Amino acid sequence: MNSPVFYDHFERHAHGAGLKGHSTHYCPGCGHGIVHRDLADAIGELGLQDRTVLISPVGCAVFAHYYFDVGNSQAAHGRAPAVALGHKLANPDAIVISYQGDGDLASIGLAETISTAQLGLPITVIFINNAIYGMTGGQCAPTSLIGQKTTTSPAGRDRAMGSPLRVAELIAQLDGPIYVERVALFDPKQRVKARRAIQKALRLQAEGRGYAFIEVLAECPTHLKLTPELAEAWVRDQMVPVFPLGVKKDLTVEPWFHCGPPSYDVEKFLALVGAEPLEPDTEPPVPATSAIGDLSLKFAGAGGDGAQTAALLLTRAAIDAGFDATHIPSYGPESRGGTSYADVHIAAGEVLNPAAPEPDILVAFNAPSLAKFAPMVAPEGTILYDGGVITQLPALPAGCRVIAVPFTEIARGLGRPVAKNMVAIGALQGATGLLPPDRFTITLRHLLKDKPSLLPLNEAAFEAGRRAVCPPSVPT
Amino acid sequence: MSHFTTARPRPFLDPAYCKACLRCVEACAKHCITPGSTLNTITGVAPVELHLEHCTGCALCVQACPEPFGLRLDEGMSHLEGEFRLEDPTKLFGKKRVDVVDAPIEPDEQIPLPGCAPLVLKGAYASAIGAVLAGCRHVFGYPITPSTEGAELMAKLMPELGGTFVQAVSEVAAVNMMYGAGGAGVPAMTFTSSPGFSLMLEGISYMIGAEVPGVFVNFMRGGPGLGNIAPEQSDIKLACRGLGHGNTHALVLAPSTPQEMLDLTLAAFALSFRYRNPVIMLGDGFLGQMTGVVRLPPTLSRPGRPAWAVWGDRSHRHNLISSIHLAETDLEAHNEHLNRKYAAIAKRETRAELFRCDDAEVLVVACNTPARMAKGAVEVARARGLAAGLFRPITLWPFPIDALLPLLPRTRQIIVVEASPGQLEDELRLALSHADRVPPPITHVRRGGGVLPQQTEILAQIAATQEAFA
């Protein structure tokens, strides 16, 4: 009886017509067939048929799904380990096998091979090394031997074409894998070892212990242009000296891999994204005024001035008050030092254009920012700047309202120069009446609900900024 | 058979399945197997011949045979030798236990969410939260500006929600992890930006070919090459016309607000599973960074398990995820199936926003962030008495031509506004051409390199057009 892990009829092989319904597509004497049988037997003997997902590569084994009666996925060239990882993470109970040849695993997919091995999640990689490209017709493989003639090394592989890659050794020296062995098929003794290695690799996965890698030195009689018997001898005499057989790594590891199950818990989700359920009959906030058609602001300073935080606070406060509002930062390398600026829009209806190329209000924290953006301020706009930092005024557009407030000095007076952005927000509120002052404090308290110790300073800075443009004697 | 020394099963061979590789010949220590001398009339090769007088039942020949139906151990079937019929394997082997039951489709479940205060979120975060709401618990990615915020938030959220975030070795690996997870039937996604999206195209072609769902959020940046990290819209061509090799298409969604980043990401997963096809979210660099008001939907999804998934259990065991169809007619039929799917998407899933289009003579066509500048320009133009409107395609592929055609009789001028050298305009012109419509004159406002079209220049173009009419 053939293994029950093979289909009774190879329906996917040319629709199972004629001989193809029970014959593989492999050439006579090919090592793939033997490894297929070993793998099928191992899956069957370990009782894993209903859990197995086999990833077939690009290469001669591309049609492994013709034969194996398990879940099958066929991957792009070299990407089988990444596909295998996707399957394992989707269903950690699945037994996932990445079955690959030397071109797939050791050439085009080397990055996926190494990174997946180093990750060490419990999957099984079966690597068929026959020192040649089979499917494309006998080209040089990363594992072809020095001197080996192939269609792309017609004079024999030489040093300039690189030396054969010893993959099992490469994988074994990584931290991720727990079991790495190189086996062969050239005589009955080797075939017994190969069967055992494949079975052990699968068992380690089934037990959740870790990543195992089995390199199989296999025969490609067709492209070696040898009879199967001579191909076996070639593997034994030519390949084995370059690719020594044996266990390269075998660690005893306790089962460690866990992931999931996925959670769809509503309360957990809301807490994670910071969403706060409303009382059932809560009416959405309504903008206090519709006078704000679409107001645009630009906050500009050096990195560390807090322009972004100030802009975000304003955005949030406006949204909390029922307005539509947007914030766009300058970003990228610029946001990691150098200038930093932010565009804010506030509208009673919908913010149409979120950019502020001609801001109604400019808040500038330093001289370069003021010089850069002041000329763009809309006619009859407002320019608010740190009067303590900026002492030399550039030419400012006529018709603008210009207000200097020493943000930094005031903040320093409160003991924390970094609070200058809150001083600026206070000054902005005081100078423009943009949103009632308590909207800012409500939002501020909300934002700092997990860091209440920071609240007094920020509130004080906000108030100090307001007072600097709006003395207490003048009603707000 | 009384001369057999043990009761162990002996090898058995159906000659039609012997390829005469002779590996069994040298495997047998007792020289029981010899190269054949008679050609098999079906296969044209001479199968090996078994002489089992000295056979010990060691099975080493069986282990040497590369063919599943080649040498096997005879467990009571030797009487069938010579009588085997290719046409009827069940007669030979008996009817195999049928493990494959009709795969149950576990349906998606919608779990109600309470009404919540609006969130204030960056576009990239809004998209990530949209994915979480869609039930996505598998995120694969590679850091690239300006998309990293999405991945960073997912790296935080996924472990808390029993999900997985993997920072892959490359975008190439990331898309293939999506192929694996998507092939297992779970919602998977990535955040990327233009150069990373280029690297993912191979995998996207495989996903489309193998009908694997998955959502790609691409915050387009300046190109070609390394370009820069400022916003552009120059992957429109790639997403609409160039999703890897072969006959590929995917729904391309173009949000223009943080709210739409959430809403369309949420919709993208449903569409991706409905059609078993990837869905591409094209944002621009601005949109990922833009903070705005975002309201949560009324439900959170718990995804089910599709019948076609390669899950790794009995009921899904017969499934296959593959894009290979070796026979020419098979591949042709597969592509015809894909074409019918593309046609169904084009018929059912196009979306557009029409802003003040009803009596518009000048139609501005724009998407993503430039559409917001265009909206501002239209609003100002209207205030000045100019009959302008904005046609904003939300699906770029398929282009929402059916929503546009009724506007054309009144339209005297189309102005395409985009942060690319004409890629949106090409989509528009192609859609008009397929609809056999001669459009009104088309002009454009195009910026690039990270410079977005500004409201003032759009407005100036509208005004100039209107002057020309007068």
Predicted regions and their residues:
Chain B
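Peripheral docking tails and interdomain loops at the edges
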Residues: 418-470
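Glycine-/acidic-rich phosphate or pyrophosphate-binding loops and their flanking alpha/beta elements
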Residues: 107, 122-127, 339-362, 375, ...
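Iron-sulfur cluster-binding cysteine motifs and their immediate structural context
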Residues: 23-43, 60-79
